[in-house]
Amino acid sequence: LEKAGCSRIVAVPLLIAPSSHSHWDIPALLGIYSDPQVEKALREEGARLVRTAVPVTVTTTLDKSDVIERILLKRVRQLSRDPKREAVVLLAHGSEAIPPAWDRFMRRTVTYICGQTGISYGDWAAVGVGQEYSRAAAAMQEAARHKDRVIVVGAYLSMGVTRMHGRWMARFNEQGGEMPGMENPLQGLNLELAEQGLLPDKLVTQWIVDTARSEVQRHP
């Protein structure tokens, strides 16, 4: 971009919510944040640090817009049959570095979905990419105590929740499972799992364009 004659670069991180990636890794990669430990870790992962004379600005993550709520509302509506009998559980990656930001975003999203659909019970859990799925299981169990049917959606860009759920269920298989013979707390629950994440959706594409354009307009 510098060689092409760009006078300014606006980097829009396609990330769900604030994390170590948005706050430290990406800025360090782009040369606008300096931390020897972060830079060492990035180099060990094969990343090449960028150093340019062109001013670089990193913008906010998706959670600062209403895009996630609007897309997940569509996912829930696709799965919903009788809102009065249903609960919704939202799963997301979460961040050990900045947990409050994720908790606020998940609470806001579930509240919005419930308000728009008439579903009266909602919960959420930060599960990484499935390594903390026991948190999801606990949320689903509790939801199933309140409602007959539990809709589970994920705030992930490229995946739904079915794959994570399948890995969890496989742990209890008699053959090849990690915990054969143990009681599966999710067995027999009436769960409806979203197969699709946030993408593909035009709202995400438009958010990228709008975010970059807004930054340029605010700071010409």
Report residues per predicted region.
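Extended amphipathic ligand-handling, pore-lining, and cofactor/metal-binding catalytic surfaces
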Residues: 1-220
